[in-house]
Protein backbone atom coordinates (compact mmCIF):
# COMPACT_ATOMS: atom_id res chain seq x y z
CA UNK A 1 0.00 0.00 0.00
CA UNK A 2 2.91 2.34 0.62
CA UNK A 3 4.11 2.15 -2.95
CA UNK A 4 0.74 3.05 -4.47
CA UNK A 5 0.96 6.85 -3.88
CA UNK A 6 4.50 6.89 -5.26
CA UNK A 7 3.37 4.95 -8.32
CA UNK A 8 0.48 7.35 -8.91
CA UNK A 9 2.74 10.41 -8.59
CA UNK A 10 5.26 8.92 -11.03
CA UNK A 11 2.47 8.08 -13.44
CA UNK A 12 1.22 11.68 -13.33
CA UNK A 13 4.72 13.05 -13.88
CA UNK A 14 5.29 10.83 -16.89
CA UNK A 15 1.94 11.84 -18.38
CA UNK A 16 2.73 15.55 -17.98
CA UNK A 17 6.06 15.27 -19.78
CA UNK A 18 6.48 17.95 -22.50
CA UNK A 19 5.74 16.83 -26.03
CA UNK A 20 8.16 16.93 -28.95
CA UNK A 21 6.69 20.26 -30.11
CA UNK A 22 7.57 21.90 -26.78
CA UNK A 23 11.31 21.54 -27.39
CA UNK A 24 13.29 24.77 -27.66
CA UNK A 25 14.09 25.74 -31.24
CA UNK A 26 17.54 25.14 -32.62
CA UNK A 27 19.32 27.29 -35.17
CA UNK A 28 18.14 24.92 -37.90
CA UNK A 29 14.50 25.56 -36.91
CA UNK A 30 14.67 29.37 -37.17
CA UNK A 31 12.93 30.62 -40.32
CA UNK A 32 15.02 32.37 -42.94
CA UNK A 33 13.00 35.59 -42.66
CA UNK A 34 14.03 35.88 -39.03
CA UNK A 35 17.69 35.63 -40.02
CA UNK A 36 17.17 38.27 -42.72
CA UNK A 37 15.52 40.60 -40.19
CA UNK A 38 18.45 40.14 -37.81
CA UNK A 39 20.93 40.92 -40.59
CA UNK A 40 19.03 44.07 -41.59
CA UNK A 41 18.86 45.22 -37.97
CA UNK A 42 22.61 44.65 -37.50
CA UNK A 43 23.44 46.57 -40.68
CA UNK A 44 21.20 49.45 -39.59
CA UNK A 45 23.00 49.65 -36.23
CA UNK A 46 26.39 49.64 -37.95
CA UNK A 47 25.28 52.39 -40.36
CA UNK A 48 24.06 54.52 -37.47
CA UNK A 49 27.37 54.11 -35.64
CA UNK A 50 29.33 54.97 -38.78
CA UNK A 51 27.34 58.17 -39.31
CA UNK A 52 28.05 59.24 -35.73
CA UNK A 53 29.61 62.66 -35.20
CA UNK A 54 33.07 62.36 -33.61
CA UNK A 55 32.83 65.73 -31.83
CA UNK A 56 29.40 65.28 -30.30
CA UNK A 57 29.02 61.96 -28.44
CA UNK A 58 25.31 62.54 -27.75
CA UNK A 59 24.43 61.91 -31.41
CA UNK A 60 25.78 58.35 -31.18
CA UNK A 61 23.21 57.23 -28.62
Curated annotation (Swiss-Prot):
Lineage of the organism: Eukaryota, Metazoa, Spiralia, Lophotrochozoa, Mollusca
GO annotations of cellular component type: extracellular region
Pfam families referenced in this protein's UniProt entry, alphabetically: Chi-conotoxin
Tissue expr: Expressed by the venom duct.
Subcellular location, record wording: Secreted
Proregion positions: 23-48
Protein name from the UniProt record: Conotoxin Bt5.1
Coiled-coil residues: none
InterPro entries named in the record: T-conotoxin
Predominant cellular place of this UniProt entry's protein: secreted
Swiss-Prot/TrEMBL domain comment: The cysteine framework is V (CC-CC).
Signal peptide: 1-22
Free-text description of this protein's post-translational modifications in UniProt: Contains 2 disulfide bonds that can be either 'C1-C3, C2-C4' or 'C1-C4, C2-C3', since these disulfide connectivities have been observed for conotoxins with cysteine framework V (for examples, see AC P0DQQ7 and AC P81755).
Similarity comment: family membership: Belongs to the conotoxin T superfamily.
Keyword set includes Nuclease: no
GO molecular function, one term: toxin activity
Keyword annotations of the record: Cleavage on pair of basic residues, Disulfide bond, Secreted, Signal, Toxin
Organism the protein comes from: Conus betulinus (Beech cone)
Domain of life: Eukaryota
Amino acid sequence: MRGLPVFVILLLLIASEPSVDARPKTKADVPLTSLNDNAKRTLQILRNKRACCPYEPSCCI
